[in-house]
UniProtKB/Swiss-Prot annotation:
Signal peptide: none annotated. One of its GO terms (cellular component) is signal peptidase complex. Expressed in the pancreas (at protein level). Belongs to the SPCS1 family. May be phosphorylated. It is a multi-pass membrane protein. Residues 48 are lumenal. InterPro entries: Spc1/SPCS1 (IPR009542). It is found in: Endoplasmic reticulum membrane. Residues 81-102 are annotated as: Disordered. Keywords: Endoplasmic reticulum, Membrane, Transmembrane, Transmembrane helix. It holds the Pfam family SPC12. This is Signal peptidase complex subunit 1.
Amino acid sequence: MLEHLSSLPTQMDYKGQKLAEQMFQGIILFSAIVGFIYGYVAEQFGWTVYIVMAGFAFSCLLTLPPWPIYRRHPLKWLPVQDSGSEDKKPGERKIKRHAKNN
């Protein structure tokens, strides 16, 4: 039932994370200002809360899923380097012993 979910991308690059954070904060700030002004004019604090909550839900919808806009700059990983000491089995490694101070 959940097999198709494993094929969905779940990562975001660093520039995408920055963009998502800026969008999230901007939408919240905009909805707070609009909500405050409308609530002040209508003299209903409840409308202020509703507008801010709607802005929060909208910003979550835009920023929480890893949309393709947030994956435009994938990370370039370094290639794997062969190291002689890492390929040895644990029994083949030389054990470093510290000299005892008498």
